[in-house]
Amino acid sequence: VSLVLAIESPDQAEVTALLDCSDAYMAELYPPEGNFAVDLHALMQHDISFVVARLDGRAAGCGAIKWLTDGTAELKRIFVADDARGRGIGGRIMDFLEKLAKDRNVKHLFLETGPLNTEAVLMYRTRGFSQCGPFADYEDNPYSLFMTRDMTAGATSPEPVKQRVAS
């Protein structure tokens, strides 16, 4: 079993299907006014780097980083397919995105997630993210949890969790 992460275009049928699954998951948790996922067109802009995690060649997860101003960036659209969860893929996507941020000297990473995304919130907290106020164009609302991580405070990624990979 192999896991390969790379920057790819999100405009691929397999990847858009993954994004559709992410949208469906969010629609189960939050009303339309509480969903802030960027669409395919936005993900293809020059200020976004999009990563795909391929498990044995199949798109199993994705994530993006939006390059903001003044040494900041926002993590977006981090998602792992249901049948690929529990293998550390989300953490590997985070490792990849955090390395991209460090390579560009990003000082502060931000993200917006929902408080009902308990698995994601736990992963972000264990990686050094803490709650903050709204950033960029976001406004405070009951469906959003805003988080940030100081990339300059000697914060390092945790030791990789041993991956359980089914044979």
Predicted regions: what they are:
Residues 13, 87, 118, 141:
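Loop/helix-junction capping segments adjacent to catalytic residues or to phosphate/diphosphate-binding pockets
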Residues 87, 99, 108-110, 121:
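Charged, amphipathic alpha-helical coiled-coil/dimerization segments
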